[in-house]
Amino acid sequence: MEKIDLLSLTLKEIEEILTNMGEKKFRGKQIFQWVNKGVKTFDEMTNLSKNLRDQLAERTYITNIKIEKKLISSIDGTIKYLFLLEDCNIIEGVVMKYHHGLTACISTQVGCAMGCTFCASTLDGLVRNLRAGEMIDQILTMQEDTGERISNIVLMGSGEPLHNYDETINFLKIINDENGLNIGNRHITLSTSGLVPQIKTLADLKIPINLAISLHAPNDELRQQTMPVAKKYAIDELIDSCRYYIEKTGRRITFEYALIKGVNDRDKDARELGDLLKGMLCHVNLIPVNNVDERGYKKPSIESIHQFQNTLKKAGIETTVRREMGADINAACGQLRRKHLQN
């Protein structure tokens, strides 16, 4: 019998397992609370009988990832982690320190299949999906290591969250549970390259998380140069799915736009982007591209970035420039894992 990862299960799923074992339903709640506190052995569950702990050990297990490497930025205190999974795969996570608390950036897949040319995470393709428990354990491990509570989550590490849809939705349910990490939906941001059917399915669930769309171009021709997913879903389809999401959830959408020197940073690109997004409940986050040596991409000048931002603002689009975090430790997505794998 294949053992079940308890950390990947919702409270309801654990309760069902316990009642099927002939135990009282409340035992499921106790176990859910234990695993989401970060315990890694059944012996630590001191309010359970030894007989029940032994039965759990026979049928289930608790995901346990390890810190393989850790770098701390001397500039802003950002912490970059390489996590070692139980099958010896490597993923990344980042903790960023803000005045409102700690934000964790976590991975949802080992590698990525999306092929975006400005991202180092996708250079070696997709290895496998992460289980919900492996996503949660990134947060638990970060909390244990820092000694502080993680108050905000961004699903912006390696992988496309909506390409691992079922596990990502389970993860959202588990971390939002008041008996677990109890992180509010409005403190969670999911970033997607734009998988249109999944955006609509997510909208129908009406989970009021923050949705961020990796747009990076104002038209299909330009977007297809950097994002293979754009060949499957036209930009008009993507924008329609975003409008549907806003209609269903009432939540503002963030459009992420990686500014690449000489590729998508021209004034005409800014004007076209303003026209595309006009009238939407949205916000544009400009991201000066991180240098990816394999692609030869460079970030634009400060003047070009501000000019692009001002053009969007004149079009009535709320626009910010993302603050660079952990620049001295290669905290950008995919950079550290790739360097580790090459050594």
Curated annotation (Swiss-Prot):
Its cofactor is [4Fe-4S] cluster. The keyword Cytoplasm applies. SUPFAM superfamilies: Radical SAM enzymes. Residues 98-328 form the Radical SAM core domain. CDD domains: Radical_SAM (cd01335). One of its GO terms (biological process) is tRNA methylation. The keyword Methyltransferase applies. One of its GO terms (molecular function) is rRNA (adenine(2503)-C2-)-methyltransferase activity. It is found in: Cytoplasm. It catalyses: adenosine(2503) in 23S rRNA + 2 reduced [2Fe-2S]-[ferredoxin] + 2 S-adenosyl-L-methionine = 2-methyladenosine(2503) in 23S rRNA + 5'-deoxyadenosine + L-methionine + 2 oxidized [2Fe-2S]-[ferredoxin] + S-adenosyl-L-homocysteine; adenosine(37) in tRNA + 2 reduced [2Fe-2S]-[ferredoxin] + 2 S-adenosyl-L-methionine = 2-methyladenosine(37) in tRNA + 5'-deoxyadenosine + L-methionine + 2 oxidized [2Fe-2S]-[ferredoxin] + S-adenosyl-L-homocysteine. One of its GO terms (cellular component) is cytoplasm. Its EC number is 2.1.1.192. S-adenosyl-L-methionine binds at residues 159-160, 191, 214-216, 290. Specifically methylates position 2 of adenine 2503 in 23S rRNA and position 2 of adenine 37 in tRNAs. Belongs to the radical SAM superfamily. RlmN family. PANTHER family: 23S RRNA METHYLTRANSFERASE (PTHR30544), RADICAL SAM CORE DOMAIN-CONTAINING PROTEIN (PTHR30544:SF5). This is Probable dual-specificity RNA methyltransferase RlmN. It comes from Alkaliphilus oremlandii (strain OhILAs). The lineage of its organism: Bacteria, Bacillati, Bacillota, Clostridia, Peptostreptococcales.
